[in-house]
Amino acid sequence: MNVIYTKNAPAAIGPYSQAIVTNGLVFTSGQIAINPESGAVEAQTITEQTEQVCKNIKAVLEAAGSSLENVIKTVCFLKDMSDFAAFNEVYGSYFTGKPARSCVAVKELPKNVLVEIDTVAEVSE
């Protein structure tokens, strides 16, 4: 088991890693719209936040030897399901392979963000 860390994605804000690689798979922790350069949530809209989340996931996957194209499954958390269409528009531009997915509305997310996504992906050989 290997713990993944990259400066190109936000550092964990709790007692967890950015990702773990084991048995040819990478499991990313949930990513929120923290800008890794500033350490702050700067994006305000669901579109902007989803864009930042996807960039963060891409950076973690690349650090783990994987990519967005290798994603098998995502779990998506939205603060408001009325954001579903706008979220899907950005999400679909990043996850073009259409991985399996769960998407649920939740009452609240860390730092009061609008979206959080975690992934499972194959590690490139």
Can you annotate each of these PLM segments?
Residues 1-125:
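Short, polar/acidic, helix-capping and beta-turn segments at strand->helix junctions
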